[in-house]
From Swiss-Prot:
Native source organism of the sequence: Neurospora crassa (strain ATCC 24698 / 74-OR23-1A / CBS 708.71 / DSM 1257 / FGSC 987)
Pfam families, alphabetized: Gp_dh_C, Gp_dh_N
Binding-site positions, NAD(+): R12, I13, D34, R79, N315
The name this protein goes by in its record: Glyceraldehyde-3-phosphate dehydrogenase
GO MF, one annotated term: NADP binding
Family the entry assigns: Belongs to the glyceraldehyde-3-phosphate dehydrogenase family.
Pathway terms, separated by semicolons: Carbohydrate degradation; glycolysis; pyruvate from D-glyceraldehyde 3-phosphate: step 1/5
Record's catalysed reaction(s): D-glyceraldehyde 3-phosphate + phosphate + NAD(+) = (2R)-3-phospho-glyceroyl phosphate + NADH + H(+)
Subunit structure: Homotetramer.
EC number: 1.2.1.12
Amino acid sequence: MVVKVGINGFGRIGRIVFRNAIEHDDIHIVAVNDPFIEPKYAAYMLRYDTTHGNFKGTIEVDGADLVVNGKKVKFYTERDPAAIPWSETGADYIVESTGVFTTTEKASAHLKGGAKKVIISAPSADAPMYVMGVNNETYDGSADVISNASCTTNCLAPLAKVIHDNFTIVEGLMTTVHSYTATQKTVDGPSAKDWRGGRTAAQNIIPSSTGAAKAVGKVIPDLNGKLTGMAMRVPTANVSVVDLTARIEKGATYDEIKEVIKKASEGPLAGILAYTEDEVVSSDMNGNPASSIFDAKAGISLNKNFVKLVSWYDNEWGYSRRVLDLISYISKVDAKKA
């Protein structure tokens, strides 16, 4: 079953979701909406990407629309989500990637244009959050607006699930060493709510807040209140890494922990949690579609109950792939209920 998908917001994640969809057999992007980009510029931005390279295919402009690999993609420029005529193209599932409409009420506006479901590509204050491989099986089709959580939660949650299921996490602290993103500054500038966040991204390591660890408690209720974390924004353009330091109830050697993670990466979490013993660095993970790539040689343990685990993630590519995997999954659940 091919699912027809629309994208609202053709920024960083919107475009990377589009590129990933080309490799996703059961996803067809039929429409894009962005009020700030004209079709010719959208085609240019999709064709050329500093981080992920040139688009491997054909991109043309036909009037006000795009033609990608010979298939027409309707291009809208509506500012109000409620005004986007998604039903014209049959787009049933909408990726809400503007970063603006992140609540159930705001994202629900897409339903007025004929969409059936909205997937927010960011954490949401009130929409149910799903992380593939962790709690996606709890989706029952009742919610019209859902969230794919954050890229960091998608990296941390599968790892935390494996550790908790096998050894029981008593408590833990997470640090994500995170590449800079579009919200940061190219030169020092005003940032009233976060003074440090206003400093030049390419020249500083910037301590920052993140709700990613606490959000794990929403997708793994048993870990609610047991994890928290922070971020260090660093001068790299893409790829980030999670450092999870946890106290576990059931003692285990580091080798035993590695074996459990390796087994999960080859079994139930294949494609979501990956495992490597190579001497990798961040750029080696650019374009990796996994949510979380466990680095077996980077972790350490103090004793059998206190361990530090390290896992990489392409915060653009891997996250965008999960957005599409989530749509593919929920569309099958929805079809059974129809």
